[in-house]
Amino acid sequence: MTTPELKSLLHVRNLKMSYGGIQALRGVDLDVAHGELIALIGSNGAGKTTLLKVLAGLLQPASGTVHYRGTPLIHHAAHQLVQEGLTLVPEGRGIFARLTVKENLQMGSYCRSDEPSIDRDMQNVYELFPRLFERHKQLAGTLSGGEQQMLALGRALMSRPTLLMLDEPSMGLAPMMVTKIFETIQEISARGVSILLVEQNAKLALEVAQRGYVLENGLITSSDSAAKLLVSPAVRQAYMGS
């Protein structure tokens, strides 16, 4: 019999995390299947970014279990998780402003030694984001916000992720650039990369996802197909203003 943690690519159960005496996560259960695009929505301060940081190995939980590809992940370092195929694009992008676009992309492959494949992957990133190729010698800090988000995504892809976690990819971007970024997210998903998407624009996130979770006050309060969450009166009132 296949156990739940082996069936899912990512299997999270009863995950708890505290900052001092404040409980940020109060027993989160979440699953991501192979090839799924999952939306995680919730209000500011709900615990979404904390959850992603725990999953990425940047924070240690108080208790609970995380299985990735059937293997327990608690106490793994962040660089080990990147090597295993779990990559986070953080809120605020986290690019290296004083490095060039190309150097930023090369940093994404720091855990790899397969030079020919790295070169091919960089060409694939340039095909996905032609603007990055046009600016590959330019310092990353001089790029526009949208171009920096492209670079953050491209750098993450250079690690060859199996699960890509995105924290607020539309934040601070113009509407046209948001459309471009989300089209690219869908294209990455279509290539077979599993995606866990945290996004302030709940409607947009659910429109591109297969399933969704609602996180409030450190707890998952609802989970369903994205289509059903999109028409849920409670979800629409709380997160879409209608």
Pin down the residues of each PLM region:
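ABC ATPase C-loop
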Residues: 156-157
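Helix-to-loop junction immediately C-terminal to a conserved catalytic motif
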Residues: 56
